[in-house]
Amino acid sequence: TSLPYVNIHCSLTQNIEMPQTDAAYIYLVVEGTLRLYTPAGIMDYESGQYSISAIDTPETGYILAKSDSQRFVAVSVEFNPSDVITILLELDKDLIGRIAGGQQSEQMMDMSDGEVTRSVTRLLEIADDPVKAEFLGRNIRREIIFHLLCGKSGTEFMESIIRLQNSGDIYEANTWIKENYKGAFTVE
């Protein structure tokens, strides 16, 4: 694609290569069924489901079932910690508190998990149009990160990205920054 952080993975063989990157990524199954071997165990993913590498970095993958067209297709979308932290700093402090405390409603988490898939689909739809990809791609990727944070794995995702044992520290830091700094600033 024209978006450097989006990759399409197709495989006709049973074994698949996971993305070789230091960046965090989601790996969304588009066609087929996948089994991932991670440090936490074995996990299966069907079409429309995704894995978050920052939570459980897959070691290997194996195709359990191919689509009717006898292929396996997945999409990976990469992001770095600064992408996620920037979004965390922009979020409402109450929302960050609910994410950090694992207190999102089931309905909100289910909706957000579904929105991740829809947002990735939209990203693919614009990926071949350089004008749309440059502007909209950036915003859709932010949308994906937002929905990952609000989804069922939001707390683990946030903790793994910022590498803190207690995600409450982020909530407190974000609250302090919002209360004490009204102007723009950068974090190095």
Residue ranges and their predicted role:
Residues S67, A100-G101, T155-F157:
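Short glycine/proline- and charge-enriched loop/turn segments
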Residues M43, V131-L136:
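Short, solvent-exposed positions on alpha-helices
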Residues S2-G97:
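N-terminal regulatory/effector-sensing and dimerization cores
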Residues D110-E125, G137-R141, I145-L149, F157-V187:
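A short, Lys/Arg-enriched amphipathic alpha-helix from helix-turn-helix/homeodomain DNA-binding modules
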Residues L89-R118:
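Aromatic/histidine-rich interaction motifs
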